Amino acid sequence: MNDRHPPSVSTHRHATRMDDRSLIRQTIRTVPDWPSPGVQFRDITPLLQSPKVFRVLIDQFVHRYFDLRPDAIAGLDARGFIIGSVLAYELNIGFVPIRKKGKLPYTTVEESYELEYGSAAVEIHTDAVKAGDRVLLIDDLIATGGTMMAGKRLLERLGATVIEGAAIVDLPELGGAAKLRAAGLPLFTLVSFEGH
């Protein structure tokens, strides 16, 4: 028996999805030269500070994924936890954290990925998903795609199928979305920004 409940989506708004996406885009703060010179950091925290805008943001993902019926949502450390856990709650499904190496207390599997200068690793608990689970992988932003690709590989190593990768922001100039799509991962993003 499926114990999912209908989403608690706002019904009092009359805005279109494009209006919603414009609101989301306008609310994201751009911080120049952070964390290093030349970088235009896309800060999603203003989206979370307004209950109205946060609801609009979550509703975008609820509308997308309610009928697709994933078995679980896996969120990438750390901002993917914010969106992913709320979305999992709205869809009445489980949430799986994919953490930076050394942050999970139980038995884990690890996947490394390349950074601009060096490498990093993420981990997942070995019992986080079951073979055959259909999982949505979510983060706040797609830049180079390295973290999301590592998350995809972790979930697949545990036997899950990643049905889609999702993010609020795509930075297409960094090539991550193209790389992920070329690796067979469908993507859903709400807004894109030129420059990085």
Swiss-Prot record:
It is found in: Cytoplasm. GO terms for biological process: adenine salvage; AMP salvage; purine ribonucleoside salvage. It catalyses: AMP + diphosphate = 5-phospho-alpha-D-ribose 1-diphosphate + adenine. PROSITE patterns: PUR_PYR_PR_TRANSFER. Its main location: cytoplasm. Pathway: Purine metabolism; AMP biosynthesis via salvage pathway; AMP from adenine: step 1/1. Homodimer. Belongs to the purine/pyrimidine phosphoribosyltransferase family. Catalyzes a salvage reaction resulting in the formation of AMP, that is energically less costly than de novo synthesis. This is Adenine phosphoribosyltransferase. It comes from Methylibium petroleiphilum (strain ATCC BAA-1232 / LMG 22953 / PM1).
